Amino acid sequence: MDNSTIESSIGQIRKRNGKVDSFNMDKITNAIYRALAATSKADRGLAEELAQGVVSKLMTQGFSASRQPSVEDIQDMVESTLIENGHSEIAKAYILYRHERRKVRDEKMKVLNTQTLDPVAKHFDLNCLRVLASRYLLRNNKNEITESPSQMFERVAILIAIGDLLYDSTLFTKDGNSKQNTDEAHSYLEKLDSFDYKFKIGDYYLNKYHFRSLINHYITLANKGQMKVGFKDLLTKIAAKQFDNYAEKISEYYELMVSQDFLPNSPTMMNAGGRLGQLSACFVLDMPDDMAGIMKSTSDAALIFKSGGGVGINYSDLRQEGDIVASTSGVASGPVSFMNIINTVTEVVKQGGKR
């Protein structure tokens, strides 16, 4: 019996999260092969033979397309098949492998504060998930994680695709001669909550912050005379699924990030499709040579750090240490003293935030 016939006979399996997935005999073969490799007996042919034995036991015990085995059922069958075929050493390696996998799985769920792992969490190693949990995954006001890694990458991918959508040839013109009234678009900013997950591109729903980004992008382009349609007409077109082809873009961006072939900068991961919406990583600020300007730059730097951005500051306008300050008849403390102030402020903000 070939693999395709076997797989169709079993049909599906029940995963730990309760979902049903297609039965794949290669996964059993690969698990056994890893156990063989752990005992320095890496033999693909033997792994395939033992996997066939596991499937035979499953079918003998009545598992079929109408009675799906669970992941645990299959793993128990692997252990018993190895022992029954005289491979006790390999069975021990498999049991240890299974135990280690369970430990990693439990630790991942603890890090993400969840009872189940999505496909991305299963694929990413523990250190990656620790970084995502500490810096990038959204949290509520109780500091509890509120999204999975898959949801985070989807949130980012949707926002990136919104920019592409507005440059669609049916919406965008380069000549700048298309006049649209943006008052209507502005009015939607006052009722964002009413549009949370109301519109979607393909199967991807826009949350209220995606919707806000759509409005702001539209207003920017409309003010340049580059939007061919009014904002209400744009929403009508989205609702009519005229731009569902951009779901492919969302999926493409998503897969690039999940595969780690490409990752955007930190603020984009933190804020895309979120409340702050600040995507830029680097800012340059001037430091004017007066106290009000110095404090304003200090405040701006703190707010940028709070949103996940980084700051470079031009101190060249500040007078050197010891110069006379006419307004107070005192002397200037110099750029280094204000560098220390900025450093202290941003360190405090960094420790309490994501930067």
Question: What residues fall within each predicted segment?
Answer:
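Extended catalytic cores of very large enzyme megasubunits
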Residues: 1-355
